[in-house]
Amino acid sequence: MSENLIIFNARIVTPTGISARKGAEMGQLRIIENGTVEVTKGIITYVGESRGEDRDGYYQHYWHYNARGHCLLPGFVDSHTHFVFGGERSEEFSWRLKGESYMSIMERGGGIASTVKATRQMNFLKLRSAAEGFLKKMSAMGVTTVEGKSGYGLDRETELLQLKIMRSLNNDEHKRIDIVSTFLGAHALPEKYKGRGDEYIDFLIREMLPVIRENELAECCDVFCEQGVFSVEQSRRLLQAAKEQGFLLKLHADEIVSFGGAELAAELGALSADHLLQASDAGIRAMADAGVVATLLPLTAFALKEPYARGREMIDAGCAVALATD
């Protein structure tokens, strides 16, 4: 297909501005009934009302597509994904059906620990190939940008490997999706550091953050701030250190119990707090006041058989709410 493209006779639904919409603003959309999108040399150069697509032969070197009144949307942004990993967890499905909780599965070596073990056993090429396959499927569903997390290594070598794979895919000239990388070394406590969470946070701060920053392997730093994983104080210490080194901040927050993760996200000026199934009223208000995006992951709640996050209450409180897949 030509790099020059005209899509005309489209009903375009498009956002305006470059900042997040909050509260009632989220219900406002710009709709262009007889719209045109112009792409020149692979770059979108015009979105707006029709302006005569065949005038004076201007577009004779463009490929023309008549949308016939169908809806045209911007590409989806999936702002919370883990697409670089090894293995699968099909056996855990039966455990869930029998009523086992997320944390009990983790305690018996399943969940994150299971995927960490499988990921550590795979090399660069195998992990990259699998990740590329996931990106192709996402692209086919209209996704054009993803945030991708590490977090299935929990050691220096494998965490860096995951981030290098994301950089490799993002630098590929044939890529279908733009990737924003997040370092999630604090996804769980590795077996090596069992009972020594503070020491593991020290390791991440001293040995991981500087290397990742120096090599520009990630833009964001994330932490699983949750009872039985990393405490509020441990999360604060890691994120403050990351912020001082120039990382944007994200949190897995208040997924299992109300734990103060939303409040911490607001305190530190995080880009987003994610999950939030158990976020408190105070946490929601604090996020709204601080401009922290509430990223909701309904598929996770569905898989865990948990109530969905209180998205409507977050919007009514003035939060910007995003949806992602996990």
Question: Over which residues does each language-model region extend?
Answer:
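Alpha-helical segments flanking ligand/cofactor-binding loops in enzyme cores
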Residues: 74, 136, 236, 240, ...
